[in-house]
Amino acid sequence: MRPSTLASASAELAPAHAVPDPPLQRRSTIAAILARPSGKAGLVFLLLTLVVAFLAPYLARTDPFALSGTPLAPPTLAHLMGTDALGRDLLSGVVHGARASLMIASAVAAVALACGTAIGLVVGYRGGLLDDALSRTTELFQAMPRLFLVAVVIALFGPGVDRLVLTLGLTSWPVLARVVRSEVLSTRNAEFVLAAEALGASPTYIAWRVLLPNVLPSVAVMVGLLFGQVLLTEASLGFLGLGDPNTLSWGLLVGASQGFLRVAWWLAVFPGLAITIAILAFNLLADALSAALGGR
């Protein structure tokens, strides 16, 4: 069948799907998210986190690495969050650390999203041995805690943002792949997919233009949860002393507080509060999105 014939036939079949207009569908989904208290709270927390990250140089003009006060000074008007063991302003550290932590989480999510979506689409549509291989791979990663795998890699090759991103990304994609596979399996025999196959559409076209739009909502929920998991993992590595000492992040600040928990509570409380707010933002939005999509 010629491409023009395929396109015209596809256009004739499109109304039968009863798919809402994409802009209207997006608006209704956003409205459903904001109608829930968790969605509103998550959006407020997310906007707060993003504003702090992007406006860090204007919100905290003090160099986070400058020795600007008395070491281990409690919160005062001069240093609203106190100072660390070297006399550096903790507020500047928390504000500037937001950018690095969010960039790490975004990079990990991008790696996991690219790998998980592509593999899940192929495995779900093709099945067979690929399906068995994905199941075994996922079980392997689930049997070994992610934090343990990352800690082993960092212990062997040394700390670094690139190693952290690659390790977290490559250990996070199996979960996304399973979600995508499950969604593809539930729609691969739908009428609109069978119609596309009957019209001669290629497997690549079906996977990326027909099946992918149907799995994106579920993927968005998983990515939101993944952001929170990455932030928590990065903070845990920092607390264990496995963070990158050359990158100012919330995890590094939490790690620096380890030896002063009894005498300087603010060193752990304020970075921990920032991490909690960011994790809540992504988890609450993911929960609201899942509810808006009917629990998919």
Label every model-predicted segment:
Residues 17-65, 137, 215-216:
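N-terminal signal-anchor/first transmembrane alpha helix
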Residues 22-37, 62-109, 252-272:
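Periplasmic/extracellular loop-to-transmembrane helix junction in inner-membrane transport proteins
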Residues 56-59, 104-139, 151:
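Transmembrane-helix boundary motif in ABC transporter permease subunits
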Residues 80, 84, 124-125, 130-186, ...:
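Generic hydrophobic transmembrane alpha-helix motif, especially the helices
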Residues 83-88, 125-126, 195-214, 254:
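Short helix-to-coil transition segments within interhelical loops
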Residues 99-115, 150, 154, 204-234, ...:
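Transmembrane alpha-helices
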Residues 153-156, 184, 232-274:
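Glycine-rich helix-loop "coupling/hinge" segments at transmembrane-helix boundaries
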Residues 161, 170-171, 217-227, 265-296:
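C-terminal transmembrane helix and the adjacent membrane-cytosol boundary/short C-terminal tail
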